[in-house]
Amino acid sequence: MRRTKAEAAETREAILLAAEQVFLERGVNQSTLTEIACYAGVTRGAIYFHFEDKLDIFQSIIGRARFPQEEIMLQAARFDHPNPLHILEQSIVAALELFATDERQQVVFTIINQRCEYVGEMAPVIDRLKEMRSDVLALFIGLLKVAERRGELASEWSAETAAQILLAMVGGFLNEWLHGEKGFDLIIHGSRVISTVIQSLRAPANIPQ
């Protein structure tokens, strides 16, 4: 009997969920398709029906995950907003809030940053991660250039430098929170720090009283 599309989709989902757990526990490089198949309760043949190899599985996990960076991109897409620094701050805080409540994001972020060595068969993943970072950086720069044109960005800052610092801070916060076993309130502390940094980016005449 032929499998329905729904059944095939369920099997594919089960494989991806299993892979996430195996990668989290064993590390991507050390994990095998046999382990993933066993965890998912399927055969290796079922895995090869949906994926070419382990790299394809990992790329699929990255591709379907909703990352904080993508949340920022969705919320801050309007470069013509009259208050770009406010939009940028809101977007970053929204990303932190989403991450703090989404265990799936946390698992995938942990795998990407702590459970994979990007050598050998995993080397191609670097290009995808670089592309993601470049997209977010370009978005940040776009918003900050609007602030610059409006005279809202302090003269000692360039849009590029400010964007790089903000992006590094977001990644650093997420890493520190996970490394520290969530020992602090990501939303409260993150929001305060981001607000302080955004304030430091404002030209004196544009700092809210």
Swiss-Prot record:
Represses expression of bepDE. The gene is bepR. The lineage of its organism: Bacteria, Pseudomonadati, Pseudomonadota, Alphaproteobacteria, Hyphomicrobiales. It comes from Brucella suis biovar 1 (strain 1330). Keywords: DNA-binding, Repressor, Transcription, Transcription regulation. It comes from the Bacteria. This is HTH-type transcriptional repressor BepR. The keyword S-adenosyl-L-methionine does not apply. Residues 32-51 bind DNA. The keyword Repressor applies. InterPro entries: DNA-bd_HTH_TetR-type_CS, Homeodomain-like_sf, HTH-type_TetR-like_transc_reg, HTH_TetR, Tet_transcr_reg_TetR-rel_C_sf, Tscrpt_reg_MAATS_C. Residues 9-69 form the HTH tetR-type domain. One of its GO terms (molecular function) is DNA-binding transcription factor activity. PROSITE patterns: HTH_TETR_1 (PS01081), HTH_TETR_2 (PS50977). Pfam families: TetR_C_2, TetR_N.
